[in-house]
Design a protein with these regions (language model features):
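Bacterial N-terminal signal peptides
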Residues: 8-16
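Alpha/beta-hydrolase active-site loop
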Residues: 127-182
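Alpha/beta-hydrolase fold nucleophile elbow
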Residues: 180-194
Length: 351
């Protein structure tokens, strides 16, 4: 009689768990629901350390946890077998939406405060920021300006987080994203996404590591860096961008430059999403010009779910729902007609 509870528990776990290396993900959750989880990187992995010299902390000045990571999945929705890694502060509205599309989502704690500390020389070296981004993402030695070991890189923290999620929330099918031998993530099933600084690091990482797609809100930037023109392990048709025309990134040709150097012009023209319905001519370059009262700061953060996003005056509902779904789910092989490079967009920028 004493063995019955253990047997029942084992049976329950076997019903919910996912075998590593599966070709297709299917949920087997006896109580389908929207799961939302949090965990500290330092509690998941004892190797995690703080790097105060670049503002990469485990606790803030008040002693509060600074390394909390977020994850969510909705097992009521048929899974697409794709994992979104969000490279910015947690955005509940965005996570709710990508979960509703059938996507898993996590936000990992990684080094992203270095931007105001490192690469301050003028002119800045053309590889300086790109190399730090790659080291922050991989935990490998690409830069002399920082020292970020493997356990503190985005790749390893994402891997350790997904392993933890697989144990804590087997109903969510997180094990699907682990390699067959359980030693890493299935990166070709990962969607790298971020805004501004986070979108820039996402795109830099995708040059190095083949991923399912990149979703860049208000980015990438790095107008004085050359990494955008490097060969890409991620096919060019998998990069998607969305920004507001009053965002300062357009004033300095940051976005047009990055988008063209990444090859996004080969898959369609700039499309104003407020004037064309989805699927937006299958393009990769999406813009909006809705009224932000001339506020460039609002424009910069207006293209993702949040208080500054475009909402209907009468309904109060978001007006870019179709855009967000397109960015994360549009078939990568469905592409628009190639366009020429814009001669008015300055590609060779110097400080």
């Amino acid at each position: 009689m004493q063995k019955a509870p253990a047997f029942i528990l084992a049976l329950a776990l076997s019903c919910c768990s996912v075998t590593y290396g599966q070709s297709k993900l299917r949920f087997n959750d006896p109580k389908p629901q929207h799961y939302k989880l949090k965990a500290r990187a330092s509690e998941i992995d004892s190797r995690v350390k703080a790097h105060p010299e670049i503002g990469f902390l485990i606790e803030d000045k008040k002693g509060k946890p600074a390394d909390v990571q977020d994850a969510s999945v909705d097992t009521r929705v048929a899974p697409k077998g794709k994992l979104v890694i969000w490279m910015m502060s947690h955005n509940k509205g965005l996570f709710d939406r990508v979960n509703s599309y059938g996507l898993h989502a996590i936000r990992v704690h990684y080094a992203n405060k270095w931007f105001s500390i490192c690469c301050k020389d003028k002119p800045v070296g053309e590889h300086c920021r790109g190399n730090i981004r790659l080291e922050a993402a991989t935990g490998q030695d690409f830069s002399d300006e920082v020292d970020i070991p493997k356990p503190d890189g985005m790749m390893e923290r994402a891997f350790q987080f997904v392993k933890w999620l697989d144990k804590e929330n087997p109903q969510g099918g997180w094990g699907f994203f682990l390699t067959k031998d359980g030693t890493g993530l299935r990166w070709e099933d990962v969607i790298m996404a971020g805004a501004s600084h986070g979108s820039t690091t996402s795109a830099r990482f995708a040059k190095y590591q083949k991923v399912s797609r990149v979703v860049a809100f208000c980015g990438p930037r790095d107008q004085y860096q050359s990494w955008q023109s490097l060969p890409s392990k991620t096919p060019e048709n998998r990069y998607f961008g969305f920004s507001h025309v009053l965002d300062g990134g357009w004033v300095g040709d940051h976005y047009c430059r990055s988008w063209e150097l990444l090859g996004m012009h080969k898959f369609g023209p700039l499309v104003n999403v407020d004037k064309m319905a989805a699927p937006f001519g299958n393009t990769r370059r999406l813009i909006t010009d809705f009224d932000v009262g001339g506020d460039a700061r609002r424009a910069h953060s207006s293209v993702q779910p949040g208080s500054r996003a475009y909402k209907g005056k009468k309904t109060g509902k978001y007006m870019h729902e179709d855009v967000w779904k397109y960015l994360f789910t549009h078939p990568v092989d469905a592409v628009g007609k190639a366009t020429e490079l814009d001669p008015s967009c300055l590609k060779e920028q110097k400080q």
